[in-house]
Structure formats: C-alpha cells, structure tokens
C-alpha cells in the first residue's frame, strides 16, 4: 500500500532539485521567456551537477514507489515551465526507447539522448502532425522498407526539441490500413540526411522550450534502428491483420506512461502561482491591514491550496498504479493530467485576481 510519507532519499532529491530551480532557473526565467532562446546554459549546469543525465533518469525511474519523476518535475516547473521542459523534454524519447527498444537499442540510444556532463545533447519524440494530433490513426508519415532499410517521409509539427536534438524518435505508419496498430517507432541519429527543421513555433507560454516542425524527406533508417526490431513488428502486424484484439499505438503507449508526470508539471506552475499570491497577500496593506486578513482573499487562497493538494494525490495514485499494477484500469494517468491542468489554470487565474487586490 502507498505511504504518503516520502522517504529520506526522496526528500533529499526533491530538495536538491528545488534548490537548483531556485538558484539556477528562477533568476533567468524572465530572460529566456522574453528572448525565446533555448536555455543551453541552464541545461549545461544541470548536466554538470548530474540532474540532466542517464544516471539520474535511471535513479528517478527506479524509485520503487514510482513517485520520484513527479517530485522532480514539480520542482523544476516551479522554477520555470519553459526551462523545466528544456531539461525534461528528452525524457519522452527516452521513455519510448526504454518501453519499446531491444536491450541493445536501450544501451546505445538512451545515453546518446543525453550526451555527457561536458557536452549535453537533446532527444526529441516526433508524433504530432498537422492533421494527426489526438487522432494518431490519421498519421501521414510513412515508413517503407527498401533494400533492407526503412525510408521515412512526412512532416511533424509541435515537436519539443525538434530539429535541434541529436536523437529523434519518429513514429510512422508502416501499414496505414491498420490504423494505430500499423505504426512503428524509428530512431534517427544526428546528421542523418533528409531530416531537417521546419518552422520554429512562437508560443504564448513555455517559450524557453524549443518547439518546431521537422521534415522527413526520404530519410534512410537502418533496420536495426526500428525500435523493438523487425521480428517484433512483423508479429504485431500479423496479429492486427488476423483481427486479433490488441492495445493502442506505440505513440499512445508512451504518452500513457508519461501523463501523470505532465500533471506534476502543471502542479509546479500552480504551486508557484499560489506561493507568489500568498506571499503578496501577506505584504500588501489595504485598509490598514494585510489583504490576507480579508476573508475573501483568505478563502480564495485556501481553495487554491486545497485544489493543489487534491490534484497531487491523483498524480501520486496514478504513478503508484503504474509502478505496481502495470496498465491503468480507468485512464488514471489521463485523469491526473486533466485535473492538474485544470487546477493550474484556476490557481493562476485566482493568483492574478489576488495580485490586483
């Protein structure tokens, strides 16, 4: 059964990440949000201290409760959502490689996503297309086998680290008639001919994170860079063609496991807004007393804190289930992400109202 008391190790790591966010992220958050430049300096500092590394990711996801990834994500995003995503964005392709790859692919490509402490690099996970966002079955990017290699052509949009990553994990349709069950994931290394960056997006938020199109123009991918290998893919396609019931697409499987952590990112945003509004309310004097002593303000802050705590429990429950029960029974990961996103919107809106008081 899940204990609500964090271990000493979990607390130590959480506090270490919080200190990094307070010391290295918050002071430059405004600068990178204004410039919309990728925060390489912060990523390099994270790599130097071991926060952006294969070893830390292994330690984080080896946590027996499953909670540590959320603790880390919440603290980083408390510092700045955009810079946090610059540091954590590589986890999505890593999750795909770890979940789908062979032992050899895992050993080769996960370290390649991070680089070294002296020379950190990035990974990207490319699924979304102009007409295939939530509707992954409408994906137009194709992978065709020719002379032993795979040839990929198509265009992806809204890709975190797209075009600047050293490793891109790209999902493409191998057999379009099978919908999501006819898709596969491919690892594409830096410098591969035919993969280029398209338009970089200008965003209303998380602007320190690089978001761009990637264009695949007959990109040749060796067969050993098909995640899971040829035999596994052929077996999956055969089951689908025979009408055998199967699970969702490779892309959706990856998203399913990472949704609670995205929820934790929203919690970091909400918590930062709540703390800022609470501290302001203690200092702002109106009618001879701090506005936090006004019941309307106090009630609003109490509701904000309650919503944050309740949403965190959904995240923790989903992560515990993922660690101990395998698959979610009732879309618990999506529930956690949904609730946390709604809480982030509500809390930040209420914080703005308090700052106007």
Q: Model regions: which residues?
A:
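Alpha-helical interface subdomain recognition
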Residues: 1-79, 83, 100-104, 116, ...
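Short Ser/Thr-interspersed hydrophobic loop/turn segments at strand-loop and sheet-helix junctions
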Residues: 50, 73-77, 188-193, 217-220
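Glycine-rich phosphate/pyrophosphate-binding beta-alpha loops
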Residues: 78-81, 132, 157-163, 206, ...
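N-terminal glycine-rich flavin-associated loop
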Residues: 84-104, 133
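A short, Trp-centered hydrophobic/proline-enriched beta-strand micro-motif
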Residues: 118-128
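A short core secondary-structure module
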Residues: 149, 153-197
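Flexible, small-/acidic-enriched active-site or ligand-binding loops
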Residues: 193-222, 226
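Long, acidic (Asp/Glu-rich), low-complexity accessory segments flanking structured domains
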Residues: 218-249
């Amino acid at each position: 059964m899940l204990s609500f008391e964090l271990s000493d190790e979990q607390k130590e790591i959480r506090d270490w990440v919080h200190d990094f966010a307070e010391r290295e992220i918050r002071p430059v958050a405004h600068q990178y949000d204004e410039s919309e430049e990728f925060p390489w300096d912060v990523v390099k500092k994270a790599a130097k201290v071991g926060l952006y590394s294969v070893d830390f990711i292994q330690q984080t996801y080896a946590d027996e409760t499953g909670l540590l990834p959320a603790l880390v994500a919440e603290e980083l995003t408390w510092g700045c959502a955009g810079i946090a995503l610059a540091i954590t964005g590589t986890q999505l392709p890593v999750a795909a490689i770890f979940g789908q790859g062979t032992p050899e692919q895992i050993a080769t490509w996960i370290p390649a996503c991070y680089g070294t402490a002296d020379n950190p690099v990035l990974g990207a996970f490319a699924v979304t297309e102009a007409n295939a966002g939530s509707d992954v079955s409408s994906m137009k990017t194709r992978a065709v086998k020719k002379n032993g290699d795979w040839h990929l052509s198509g265009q992806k949009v809204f890709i975190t680290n797209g075009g600047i990553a050293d490793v891109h994990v790209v999902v493409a349709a191998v057999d379009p008639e099978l919908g999501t069950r006819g898709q596969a994931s491919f690892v594409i290394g830096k410098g591969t001919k035919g993969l280029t960056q398209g338009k970089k997006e200008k965003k209303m938020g998380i602007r320190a994170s690089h978001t761009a199109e990637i264009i695949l123009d007959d990109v040749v991918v060796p067969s050993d860079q098909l995640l899971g290998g040829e035999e596994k893919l052929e077996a999956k396609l055969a089951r689908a063609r025979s009408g055998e019931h199967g699970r969702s697409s490779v892309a959706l499987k990856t998203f399913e496991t990472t949704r609670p952590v995205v929820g934790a990112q929203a919690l970091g945003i909400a918590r930062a807004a709540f703390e800022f509004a609470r501290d302001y309310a203690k200092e702002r004097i109106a009618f001879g007393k701090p506005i936090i002593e006004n019941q309307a303000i106090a009630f609003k802050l109490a509701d904000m804190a309650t919503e944050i705590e309740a949403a965190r429990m959904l995240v923790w429950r989903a992560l515990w289930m993922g660690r101990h029960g395998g698959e979610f029974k009732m879309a618990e990961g999506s529930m956690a992400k949904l609730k946390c996103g709604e809480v982030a919107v509500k809390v930040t809106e209420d914080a703005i109202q308090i700052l106007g008081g």
